[in-house]
């Protein structure tokens, strides 16, 4: 019984391998990069520039604000470490004399 199961599993493995399910080479993926190859019409006229989509506010909210927040957190934690180890402790000296 066990030998029969082994034969069936080997036969199933070979059938799957032949079908391309197992032991198949992964397909090489090609990256799709937007590229404008046609710059002139068939009559020879230069085509107009493509429209540029501006992501002004979206860019500000997704890039600038989070990284400013992360930078302030890092600097605040670093200042706390410096004060904790007495490396830099601001003094309240009055030099008004």
Swiss-Prot record:
Give the species this sequence originates from: Xenopus laevis (African clawed frog)
Q: Which residues lie on this side of the membrane: Mitochondrial intermembrane?
A: 76-97
The protein here is known as Essential MCU regulator, mitochondrial
Keyword check for Transmembrane, yes or no: yes
GO cellular component assignments: mitochondrial inner membrane; uniplex complex
Transit peptide region: 1-37
Describe its membrane topology. Single-pass membrane protein
Cross-referenced InterPro entries, in alphabetical order?
Answer: MCU_reg
Q: Which family does it belong to?
A: Belongs to the SMDT1/EMRE family.
Q: What does this protein do?
A: Essential regulatory subunit of the mitochondrial calcium uniporter complex (uniplex), a complex that mediates calcium uptake into mitochondria. Required to bridge the calcium-sensing proteins micu1 with the calcium-conducting subunit mcu. Acts by mediating activation of mcu and retention of micu1 to the mcu pore, in order to ensure tight regulation of the uniplex complex and appropriate responses to intracellular calcium signaling.
Where can this protein be found?
Mitochondrion inner membrane
Q: Which residues lie on this side of the membrane: Mitochondrial matrix?
A: 38-55
Q: From the record, give the transmembrane residue ranges.
A: 56-75
Q: Cite the Pfam families for this sequence.
A: DDDD (PF10161)
An example GO BP is: mitochondrial calcium ion transmembrane transport
Q: What's in the keyword line of the UniProt record?
A: Calcium, Calcium transport, Ion transport, Membrane, Mitochondrion, Mitochondrion inner membrane, Transit peptide, Transmembrane, Transmembrane helix, Transport
Query: What does the annotation say about its assembly with partners?
Result: Component of the uniplex complex.
GO MF annotations for this entry? Answer: channel activator activity; protein-macromolecule adaptor activity
Q: What coarse category fits the chief subcellular location reported for this protein?
A: mitochondrion
């Amino acid at each position: 019984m066990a030998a029969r199961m082994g034969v069936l599993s080997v036969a199933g493995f070979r059938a799957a391998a032949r079908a391309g399910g197992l032991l198949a080479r992964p397909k090489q993926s090609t990256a799709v990069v937007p590229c404008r190859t046609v710059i002139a019409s068939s009559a020879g006229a230069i085509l107009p520039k493509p429209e540029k989509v501006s992501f002004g506010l979206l860019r500000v909210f997704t890039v600038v604000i989070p990284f400013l927040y992360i930078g302030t957190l890092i600097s605040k934690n670093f200042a706390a470490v410096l004060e904790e180890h007495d490396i830099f402790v601001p003094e309240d000296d009055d030099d008004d004399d």
